[in-house]
Regions:
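Active-site core segments that coordinate phosphate-bearing ligands/cofactors
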Residues: 1-110, 118-141, 146-169
Length: 170
């Protein structure tokens, strides 16, 4: 679980090993776009996949020996991608549930960034399985990190710290 100071509050989250690395191991960007268009996000794929890139998970389940589940692989690549996207969405839903179990207030909506934000089928699958509205924001790579860095420098300056002379910003 990670906590980041943002403005006057905290942004809490969890870092799973699951993510787009698995998708990139299996499909090119062009294939992801083409296959995604073939997915009906309102229907279940019927697959129960756990798309980890390697053995081990850290959130929402802390288990260094947790095995990826990438089979059965159907003949249809579109159906396989559908199942992988659902698997990622289920892991995300478990993460939100785990955060609430630990005392985080329930989320009202999610804001998604990056490449996945441009995939309407995946966004809808996530909405269906997580149960929250998801708003897409398409921003350049690393824009979020750049904003956090800018906020940290502004905070340091406001507190009288010289960012160039400090190895650690508040």
């Amino acid at each position: 679980i990670t906590n980041h100071r943002v403005g006057g509050g905290w942004l809490s989250g969890g870092a799973s090993n699951a993510g787009c690395a698995v998708l990139r191991q299996l499909f090119s960007d062009g294939e992801l776009q083409e296959l995604s268009r073939q997915i009906n996000p309102e229907q279940s794929s019927g697959l129960k996949l756990r798309p980890l890139p390697a053995i081990g998970e850290r959130f929402p389940i802390d288990d260094p020996s947790l095995q990826p589940v990438l089979e059965p692989r159907p003949v249809s690549d579109a159906l396989y991608l559908h199942g992988l996207l659902e698997g990622l969405a289920r892991i995300e839903a478990e993460g939100w549930q785990r955060l609430m179990e630990l005392g985080a207030p329930p989320a009202e909506r999610l804001i998604t960034l990056g490449g996945g934000a441009r995939n309407p089928q995946w966004r809808r699958i996530r909405e269906r399985l997580i149960g929250l509205p998801i708003v897409s924001r398409t921003t350049p790579p690393a824009a979020g990190v750049a904003r956090l860095a800018l906020r940290a420098v502004a905070t340091a300056n406001a507190l009288g710290h010289d960012a160039k002379e400090s190895n650690h910003l508040p």
